[in-house]
C-alpha cells in the first residue's frame, strides 16, 4: 500500500481584511498517496487555490499540520524546517497553471533551461536535461520556437517540461487545461497520465470540472465555501455521491442533466400511461444491459423502454446511468424494482403515470 506523500491535517486558513475575518479554508484534512492523481474540485471561491498555496509551501496555514514526503513543514501556523530545507522541499513540487507563464523572449528550450539556473548540473548536463524533458513531453522538434510560434497545447507542454526540470516528486496542476480546447485538453491529460506512470509522479489536479476528474483522477475531494464536503475514490464518488454539490458536478460531467431536459419534452414522458413510470437506473460493476432488462420482462412482464444510457469505465469498473420507462402492473413493477435493487442497481423514480 502506498504511503501518503502529502498530509494536510485540520487545516484552517484565515485572512484579515480591515475589520473582516475571511475563513478561506476550514478544518480540511486530506491525505494524498504517492502515485495518486488526486483531484480537488469546486467552484470559484471554494478555497481550492488557497489550499494549493499551502500544499506547495508558499503559505503557512493559520492552524493545522502539513507533512510532505515524511517531513512536517508547518504545524499550528509555524514553520518546522530551516529556510534551506524549505527551499529544497519546494523544489520537490512542480506547478503548472491555466496561463502558461512562459517568457516571450525565450525559446522553448530556454524557458525550460531557466528552471535549472540554480541547479548544480554542469552546462552540458543542463543542455542534455532540457533535450530529455522536451522529448518527454513530445516537443523536441519545437525546441527553438518562441511561445508566439506555439499553440496553447504546445505552450502547456513547455510549461510541464519546465515544471519537471528539478525532478519533483509532486506536480500540481492549477486549472491547467481551462484555457484549452477539448481535444487539446484530452492530449494534455493523456500526457499527465503517462508522466504519472513513467515517473511515479504524484499529481494534484485543481479544477472546477468534474469531467477532468473523471478522465484522469483516481481519488477526489469536493470543496465548497472552504470546507471539504466529500472525499473518496473516483469510483465511489461517481457511483454514490452523497452531497448535493457533488451530485450536481456529476450530472454535468455525465451529461445526464441535459439528457433529462430533452427526455422530459418527449411525448412518451409528457403523456406517461397510468401503468408506467419514468426511472433512473444507476449502477457500478453491474450489468443493466438487455439480459437484465429482459429478465424483468420474463419474470414480471415489465417492459423497459430505454430513453438514455451512459456508461463510463472508472478504475476498470463500468459505472453508468440509464433513463427508462418501466411499464406493467403496479405490483409487478414493485417486484421488478426489488429485483433491480438486489442486482446492485439503484432505482430512482422520476415520474409516475397519471
Swiss-Prot record:
GO molecular function: ABC-type D-methionine transporter activity; ATP binding; ATP hydrolysis activity
First-level EC class: translocase
GO cellular component annotations of the record: plasma membrane
Database matches in PROSITE patterns: ABC_TRANSPORTER_1, ABC_TRANSPORTER_2, METN
Residues covered by the ABC transporter domain: 8-250
Mode of membrane association: Peripheral membrane protein
SUPFAM superfamilies, per database record: ACT-like, P-loop containing nucleoside triphosphate hydrolases
EC number(s) recorded for this UniProt protein: 7.4.2.11
Pfam families: ABC_tran, NIL
Binding residue positions for ATP: 42-49
Subcellular location(s) per record: Cell membrane
Keywords (A to Z) from UniProt: Amino-acid transport, ATP-binding, Cell membrane, Membrane, Nucleotide-binding, Translocase, Transport
Annotated CDD domains: ABC_MetN_methionine_transporter
Family matches, as InterPro entries: AAA+_ATPase, ABC_transporter-like_ATP-bd, ABC_transporter-like_CS, ACT-like_dom_sf, MetN_ABC, MetN_ABC_transporter-like, NIL_domain, P-loop_NTPase
Swiss-Prot/TrEMBL catalytic activity: L-methionine(out) + ATP + H2O = L-methionine(in) + ADP + phosphate + H(+); D-methionine(out) + ATP + H2O = D-methionine(in) + ADP + phosphate + H(+)
Subunit structure: The complex is composed of two ATP-binding proteins (MetN), two transmembrane proteins (MetI) and a solute-binding protein (MetQ).
Family (UniProt): Belongs to the ABC transporter superfamily. Methionine importer (TC 3.A.1.24) family.
Function: Part of the ABC transporter complex MetNIQ involved in methionine import. Responsible for energy coupling to the transport system.
Name this polypeptide is given: Methionine import ATP-binding protein MetN
Native source organism of the sequence: Streptococcus pyogenes serotype M6 (strain ATCC BAA-946 / MGAS10394)
Lineage, highest ranks first: Bacteria, Bacillati, Bacillota, Bacilli, Lactobacillales
Amino acid at each position: 500500500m502506498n504511503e501518503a506523500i502529502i498530509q494536510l491535517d485540520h487545516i484552517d486558513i484565515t485572512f484579515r481584511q480591515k475589520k473582516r475575518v475571511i475563513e478561506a479554508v476550514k478544518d480540511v484534512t486530506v491525505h494524498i498517496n504517492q502515485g495518486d492523481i488526486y483531484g480537488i474540485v469546486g467552484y470559484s471561491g471554494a478555497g481550492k487555490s488557497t489550499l494549493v498555496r499551502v500544499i506547495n509551501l508558499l503559505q503557512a496555514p493559520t492552524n493545522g499540520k502539513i507533512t510532505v514526503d515524511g517531513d512536517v513543514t508547518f504545524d499550528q501556523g509555524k514553520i518546522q524546517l530551516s529556510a534551506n530545507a524549505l527551499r529544497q522541499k519546494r523544489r520537490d513540487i512542480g506547478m503548472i497553471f491555466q496561463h502558461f507563464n512562459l517568457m516571450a523572449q525565450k525559446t522553448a528550450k530556454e524557458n525550460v533551461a531557466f528552471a535549472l539556473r540554480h541547479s548544480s548540473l554542469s552546462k552540458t548536463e543542463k543542455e542534455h536535461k532540457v533535450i530529455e524533458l522536451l522529448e518527454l513531453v513530445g516537443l523536441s522538434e519545437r525546441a527553438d520556437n518562441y511561445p508566439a510560434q506555439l499553440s496553447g497545447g504546445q505552450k502547456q507542454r513547455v510549461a510541464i517540461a519546465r515544471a519537471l526540470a528539478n525532478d519533483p516528486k509532486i506536480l500540481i496542476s492549477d486549472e491547467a487545461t481551462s484555457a484549452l480546447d477539448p481535444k487539446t485538453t484530452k492530449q494534455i491529460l493523456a500526457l499527465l497520465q503517462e508522466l504519472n506512470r513513467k515517473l511515479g509522479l504524484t499529481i494534484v489536479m485543481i479544477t472546477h470540472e468534474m469531467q477532468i476528474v473523471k478522465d484522469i483522477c483516481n481519488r477526489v475531494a469536493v470543496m465548497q465555501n472552504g470546507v471539504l464536503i466529500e472525499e473518496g475514490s473516483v469510483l465511489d464518488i461517481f457511483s454514490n455521491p452523497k452531497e448535493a454539490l457533488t451530485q450536481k458536478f456529476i450530472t454535468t460531467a455525465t451529461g445526464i442533466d441535459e439528457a433529462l431536459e430533452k427526455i422530459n419534452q418527449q411525448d412518451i414522458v409528457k403523456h406517461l400511461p397510468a401503468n408506467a413510470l419514468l426511472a433512473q437506473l444507476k449502477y457500478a460493476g453491474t450489468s443493466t444491459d438487455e439480459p437484465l432488462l429482459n429478465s424483468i420482462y420474463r419474470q414480471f412482464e415489465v417492459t423497459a423502454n430505454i430513453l438514455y444510457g451512459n456508461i463510463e469505465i472508472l478504475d476498470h469498473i463500468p459505472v453508468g446511468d440509464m433513463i427508462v420507462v418501466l411499464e406493467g402492473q403496479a405490483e409487478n413493477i414493485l417486484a421488478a424494482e426489488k429485483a433491480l435493487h438486489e442486482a446492485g442497481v439503484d432505482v430512482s423514480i422520476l415520474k409516475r403515470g397519471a
